């Protein structure tokens, strides 16, 4: 090794040891907003790499001197979300990081009642890595991102977002430069008068092992996506798209760009117009694999999925979805590919209605309780056949599923040429995807050995479908600027008013008002798993809008 290289290595090691030697812990001793022993003073005193210890403090820190600025790489440890809260006093944001290569971790805190045009609870600046662990964001308000506005890297682990509100992105606004990863977390009761009750995503977002329930927005009651979105091993249930204008919809999600749904359950969502489960708009590419869509209800068309982009559907189960006029299961106006999927008709609307000038392909081995829109003509397709499904319930794994009852014609009737991956059915490890040498149709694999005797029940062809009084057309108002790709591995009663024209570094814009005064009603959901077989269809019988 040359003397120059040796000197460089020694200098680097010396710097590392110096940083480690100087890293220290600063202890918070009271709940004052400022002064000795306060969290604000600790943030002013820290150096990069330090830890702030607030584990011995309980109660509420009410901010009276503005937001807390985090301008160092620091770890902030609270006493627990149920023990220590930081309240923005409805006058300021709670935390803001600064632009730069900083790494910030926040754990064991409740962040509440923050308010500003962007990121009522937290604003995470570009190039900063922010990790939120074991924390709660509740009752924060903004124009963009009621809970968090993210332009950097956001990692959320085992946390709860509830009753946050914004014009766009009630829980999170993830900007074009933002990368968000959410795991083992719950989002409930968040609201967005415009779009994205849980999140408005312009960048890249992955949601894994999480629950999104009872959130609401005009479009995209759960997530409004114009970037790249992946949902894995998660439940999206009981969300609502309340918009009544043409192009509004997406009770669970509204997709304009790239979206993947893997091993997840989309259930009990409602749309006042189209796409109670997912509205896949013009230009959107939606891929659904090993997933369940159950009991979603659209008051016009497309109870499970409304598609005017590109839809790819494989090894999934659609059951008891409904629409008042057309397509309780899937409404297709564009490109549609389906394989190894179960379609069980709900109370209203056929399983598939396809009126498309695009490419419609059956890859075969599908099973429909009605005629399947007369498009299921591939090898092994079964139509007018009862799939014999159990109720939506806990059959093991992280999400609810419909089990195949003994004698189901879906058992051992999937593609005989299928070889893993995936290695497991929707429920994950412990539930092999292939039993008895051949895959089952749908998202659920019967685990018992032997070959059940098929007892398929033929049902009469569906009755004539009413002619809709209007033509459903998607009119997305934003276009995706994200290029990254991801590989899969309300009840809020407050109403935000708006003013600032906050425009993050993404194409989406929002009008909000800094005079947001209502306080949303917190609605914690201690049981995040979806309720078995909810019946949202009975909630409304509106007159259709053209």
Please place each PLM-identified region on the residue numbering.
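Sec-dependent, cleavable N-terminal signal peptides
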Residues: 1-24
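Predominantly extracellular beta-rich ligand-binding scaffolds that present long acidic/polar faces
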Residues: 129-137, 150-168, 173-195, 199-218, ...
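Ser/Thr-rich, Proline-interspersed low-complexity disordered segments
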Residues: 451-545
